[in-house]
Amino acid sequence: MSRRRRFKGRDVHGIILLDKPGGITSNDALQQVKRIYNAAKAGHTGALDPLATGMLPICFGEATKFSQFLLDADKRYQVTARLGVRTDTSDSEGSVVSVRPVDVSEDQLAQALDKFRGDIMQVPSMFSALKHQGRPLYEYAREGIEIEREARPITIYSLELKAFSGEEISLEVHCSKGTYIRSLIDDLGELLGCGAHVIQLRRTQVACYPNDKMLNLEKLNEILDECREQGVPPRERLDQYLLPMDSAVYSLPEVNMPPVLAAYVTQGQAVMVPHAPIEGFVRMTVGPEAEFIGVGEIDDDGKVAPRRLVRIGGDMPDAEEQAE
């Protein structure tokens, strides 16, 4: 009996800014969006806890090659925490480990918050996806195993108190990659001497993506249903919401090159481009229309070396053809 061939979906290239709902994992959200778009390949760029809502950039197709730049980008969050109760997960989904009275003034809270601004060291939560010997820490935590974790450097660019009412505080956080908001709240609670845990968490920004470009699952499913009812190919409407794949690397300096040099780059060769930066990653574009072809890095000899190349459709003409 022959195996039924598995349908792999269509080629989609670009980025959607999903407004992830609470109560599901980031991977669950990813799979739903992948199904809606009928996409062959997709990946998200930094997991949100099931409790958390907000911006979850999802990359399709060739855009997945540039997801690491979004993983490394700054993030912004809105978080509400409850003082006086500490949990093992540092959020409301965990088990309570201590209950203490709250006797904190706004001045004391302001002084405590100041300790967390700037460059600090943070110990990741045991209930995180960080790997130890190939397994995420949360698997050990669920088995009651405590793994020693080293503190890691992070940067809190801004930490603003938006509301303080009795046993609840609301904060806005602008932070570097690798920051765990649950750990931040847990550390704050311990510094205040009363304990604390996250009760609401929303990511409002990743890199420079505006939050008004986010779409939720309800809206995407609504578009899909309308297309089916009207006999319209879903891609005609869904793909209008895709952001260009190079939006993931807009923060990189652009190096524009003529087609003859781009032909060498697409074959994996480094090239010398006038006026290129002297170091770091660059966003490579071609010709007067600045067509995005990938991300390069400046070598020690000053040449632009390809690191991640876009491969869509036919190949570009080779260097010999361009030189004719």
Curated annotation (Swiss-Prot):
<dbReference type="InterPro" id="IPR032819">
    <property type="entry name" value="TruB_C"/>
</dbReference>
<dbReference type="InterPro" id="IPR036974">
    <property type="entry name" value="PUA_sf"/>
</dbReference>
<dbReference type="GO" id="GO:0160148">
    <property type="term" value="F:tRNA pseudouridine(55) synthase activity"/>
</dbReference>
<dbReference type="GO" id="GO:0031119">
    <property type="term" value="P:tRNA pseudouridine synthesis"/>
</dbReference>
<dbReference type="Pfam" id="PF09157">
    <property type="entry name" value="TruB-C_2"/>
</dbReference>
<dbReference type="InterPro" id="IPR020103">
    <property type="entry name" value="PsdUridine_synth_cat_dom_sf"/>
</dbReference>
<dbReference type="InterPro" id="IPR015947">
    <property type="entry name" value="PUA-like_sf"/>
</dbReference>
<comment type="similarity">
    <text>Belongs to the pseudouridine synthase TruB family. Type 1 subfamily.</text>
</comment>
<feature type="active site" description="Nucleophile">
    <location>
        <position position="49"/>
    </location>
</feature>
<dbReference type="GO" id="GO:0003723">
    <property type="term" value="F:RNA binding"/>
</dbReference>
<dbReference type="InterPro" id="IPR015240">
    <property type="entry name" value="tRNA_sdUridine_synth_fam1_C"/>
</dbReference>
<keyword id="KW-0413">Isomerase</keyword>
<dbReference type="InterPro" id="IPR002501">
    <property type="entry name" value="PsdUridine_synth_N"/>
</dbReference>
<comment type="function">
    <text>Responsible for synthesis of pseudouridine from uracil-55 in the psi GC loop of transfer RNAs.</text>
</comment>
<keyword id="KW-0819">tRNA processing</keyword>
<dbReference type="Pfam" id="PF16198">
    <property type="entry name" value="TruB_C_2"/>
</dbReference>
<dbReference type="InterPro" id="IPR014780">
    <property type="entry name" value="tRNA_psdUridine_synth_TruB"/>
</dbReference>
<dbReference type="Pfam" id="PF01509">
    <property type="entry name" value="TruB_N"/>
</dbReference>
<protein>
    <recommendedName>
        <fullName>tRNA pseudouridine synthase B</fullName>
        <ecNumber>5.4.99.25</ecNumber>
    </recommendedName>
</protein>
<dbReference type="GO" id="GO:1990481">
    <property type="term" value="P:mRNA pseudouridine synthesis"/>
</dbReference>
